[in-house]
Amino acid sequence: MFKNNKPPKYGNLVTILSLDGGGVRGIIGGVILANLEKHLQEIDNDESVRLADYFDVIAGTSTGGLMTAMLTAPNDSGRPLYAAKDIVPFYLEESPKIFYGSKWWDPSALWALFRPKYNGEYLHTRLGEILGETKLDQTLTNVVIPTFDIKKLQPTIFSSYHASVDPSLNAKLSDICIGTSAAPFYLPPYKFPENDKMRTFNLIDGGVTANDPTLVGMTAMSRKSIIKHPDMDGFKPLEYEKYIVISIGTGSAKREEYYSAVEAAKWGFENWAYNWKHKTTPILDIIFESSRDMVQYHTSVLFQALESEDNYLRIDADTLKKDEVFMDDSETLNLENLKNIGEKLLDTNVMRMNLDTYTYEPIPKTVNNDQELKRFAKILSDEKKLRNKTFKTMIDDSSNS
């Protein structure tokens, strides 16, 4: 399905956009997405173009899954429901209604010891209003959204490819978004459909599977090559040097130190689940961070081995403070601060993972993230034009024969 973008077989590259999970920290990613879309509009001199017009796959986990749906679900005119510039205002308005009373010193938050901190009712209702009956196979470009099924104890990956071969996976986007956002401790697991005669899903946050869904998105296109799907004619399954990947994070406090083995040796179940001293959820944080870090490590190794490091752009802020990383802090001051962090990140030098230390370091070239986004936007624009030209030539040749 390439409704707005001709498939890779008409061009030279495979283009992928990946969006991390992170709750309200999705605001950081929203700022980056808005700038990328603005660059594309400027390069192509067309304010109507959208990100879905340029990417073969948009992959998103948790809050990234929600952004994926916003960017790819069609409106009544067959265009994306939201422009990238609409994401941050959406989060600023809706986050306080989803994560109500989010401060830990609010006595009402104590009930999270016995049930999910939030009931999720507003999120469920709002997603239903926005996405309606739109199903996975109706998105304007391919999407991949990871979740985890707690009944089967295995990942469930919702993708355009899977939806095309297995009707039971062609679920409503609203259901998929609710499932991938159901972070343990914060929001209740989500079951759908209610009719047990059909295949049912019992889902929690996709972050326990792939908080950074970059490799999931790349694999989705590789799988098409393996089965020799016509969209991927001319591409071998492992030709990742022909992939253009933009991966956008939601921030972390990597420069901060957290727990010591001496301290954790005294913990029982309660402190691992929620640590009152640090006001954190250690086991959940560890799962999400390790999931994300390993994806970034393997992706970095892959592109380095192929001598194609310039094809992979990872934009993330690892300098957040501990009180800035809460996925549910919906206080106005925090939300505005996250927006400012995203804007400052654009002016920050491009970073790449040091494969020995797992930390991010500036690349030798002095170039900031916004400049690199503009370079990638030019590549995306050129690829789109090439595909359109090739397609038109083939149609013209066919008509003349």
From Swiss-Prot:
The active site is at S62 (nucleophile), D205 (proton acceptor). Belongs to the patatin family. Possesses non-specific lipolytic acyl hydrolase (LAH) activity. Hydrolyzes phospholipids as well as galactolipids. May play a role in disease resistance. Keywords: Hydrolase, Lipid degradation, Lipid metabolism, Plant defense, Transferase. Gene3D superfamilies: Cytosolic phospholipase A2 catalytic domain. GO terms for molecular function: hydrolase activity; transferase activity. The keyword Hydrolase applies. Its EC number is 3.1.1.-. Residues 17-218 form the PNPLA domain. A motif (DGA/G) lies at residues 205-207. One of its GO terms (biological process) is defense response. This is Patatin-like protein 4. The nitrogen atoms of the two glycine residues in the GGXR motif define the oxyanion hole, and stabilize the oxyanion that forms during the nucleophilic attack by the catalytic serine during substrate cleavage. InterPro entries: Acyl_Trfase/lysoPLipase, PNPLA_dom. A motif (GXSXG) lies at residues 60-64. PANTHER family: PATATIN-LIKE PROTEIN 1-RELATED, XYLOSE ISOMERASE. A motif (GXGXXG) lies at residues 21-26. The gene is PLP4.
